[in-house]
Curated annotation (Swiss-Prot):
Summary of subunit composition and partner proteins: Part of the 30S ribosomal subunit. Forms a loose heterodimer with protein S19. Forms two bridges to the 50S subunit in the 70S ribosome.
Name of the protein in question: Small ribosomal subunit protein uS13
Keyword rRNA-binding tagged: yes
Keywords: Ribonucleoprotein, Ribosomal protein, RNA-binding, rRNA-binding, tRNA-binding
Gene Ontology molecular-function annotations: rRNA binding; structural constituent of ribosome; tRNA binding
Family named by the database record: Belongs to the universal ribosomal protein uS13 family.
GO BP annotation list: translation
GO cellular component: cytosol; small ribosomal subunit
Region (Disordered): 94-118
Organism per entry: Pseudoalteromonas atlantica (strain T6c / ATCC BAA-1087)
HAMAP family the record matches: Ribosomal_uS13
InterPro entries per record: Rbsml_uS13_C, Ribosomal_uS13, Ribosomal_uS13-like_H2TH, Ribosomal_uS13_bac-type, Ribosomal_uS13_CS
Any Pfam family the entry gives: Ribosomal_S13
Length: 118
């Protein structure tokens, strides 16, 4: 298996699809990485030689992916919570951030219903 950015890339998939296994690489970014590395999008990972995989590694290394990206996102959320701004308060209370209604919906964000004692 090829390892790119610390992730085992599935070998039986096309290059574009396999690159999306990396956190921070979506389909559009995967297409641009393949184009910059000079690798055909329909080539399967198992058919690539070591030089092509190295080119893909170099292109992926130009972006913030995996652990660094996760850390960056969590630090941004923590910063909002420390500031005490509206979005930070909503994060702290595990409520929707972007103005959705919460009287009847938002079950995914709020979690299961809590029974009221009589």
């Amino acid at each position: 298996m090829a390892r790119i950015a610390g992730i085992n890339i599935p070998e039986h998939k096309h290059t574009v699809i396999a690159l999306t296994a990396i956190f921070g690489v979506g389909s559009t970014r995967a297409q641009s990485i393949c184009e910059a590395a000079g690798v055909a999008e329909t080539t399967k990972i198992k058919d690539l030689d070591e030089a092509q995989i190295d080119k893909l590694r170099d292109e992926v290394a130009k972006f913030t992916v995996e652990g660094d990206l996760r850390r960056e996102v969590s630090m941004s959320i923590k910063r909002l919570m420390d500031l005490g701004c509206f979005r930070g308060i909503r994060h702290r209370r595990s409520l929707p951030l972007r103005g959705q209604r919460t009287k009847t919906n938002a079950r995914t964000r709020k979690g299961p219903r809590k029974a009221i004692k009589k």
